[in-house]
C-alpha cells in the first residue's frame, strides 16, 4: 500500500467515527441522511460547543481527503 492510501484510509475511518458521534445530535448532523430520519435542512439551528468542534473537524478532514484523492489520482506513477 502506498503511504497516501494509508493516510486516506485512516482519515476515512476518523470521519466515519465523527459522523457516528454526530448522528445523535439533531437530525441535521452526522449520518442522519443514511439513518432515514427526517432531515430538517431549512430549520434554523445553531450547534455549539463539542458538536460544533466535531463538525468543523469533520469538514476539514473531508476537504483534505478530497484533495489527497485528487493528488493521488493525478500523480505520476
Swiss-Prot record:
Keywords: Cell membrane, Membrane, Protein transport, Translocation, Transmembrane, Transmembrane helix, Transport. GO terms for biological process: protein secretion. InterPro entries: SecG (IPR004692). The chain crosses the membrane at residues 3-23, 56-76. It comes from the Bacteria. One of its GO terms (molecular function) is protein-transporting ATPase activity. It is found in: Cell membrane. GO terms for cellular component: plasma membrane. Its main location: membrane. It is a multi-pass membrane protein. Belongs to the SecG family. Involved in protein export. Participates in an early event of protein translocation. This is Probable protein-export membrane protein SecG. It comes from Mycoplasma genitalium (strain ATCC 33530 / DSM 19775 / NCTC 10195 / G37) (Mycoplasmoides genitalium). The lineage of its organism: Bacteria, Bacillati, Mycoplasmatota, Mycoplasmoidales, Mycoplasmoidaceae.
Amino acid at each position: 500500500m502506498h503511504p497516501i492510501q494509508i493516510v486516506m484510509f485512516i482519515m476515512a475511518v476518523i470521519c466515519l467515527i465523527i459522523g457516528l458521534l454526530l448522528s445523535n445530535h439533531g437530525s441535521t448532523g452526522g449520518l442522519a441522511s443514511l439513518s432515514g430520519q427526517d432531515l430538517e435542512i431549512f430549520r434554523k439551528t445553531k450547534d455549539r460547543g463539542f458538536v460544533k468542534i466535531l463538525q468543523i473537524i469533520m469538514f476539514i478532514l473531508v476537504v483534505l481527503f478530497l484533495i489527497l484523492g485528487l493528488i493521488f489520482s493525478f500523480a505520476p506513477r
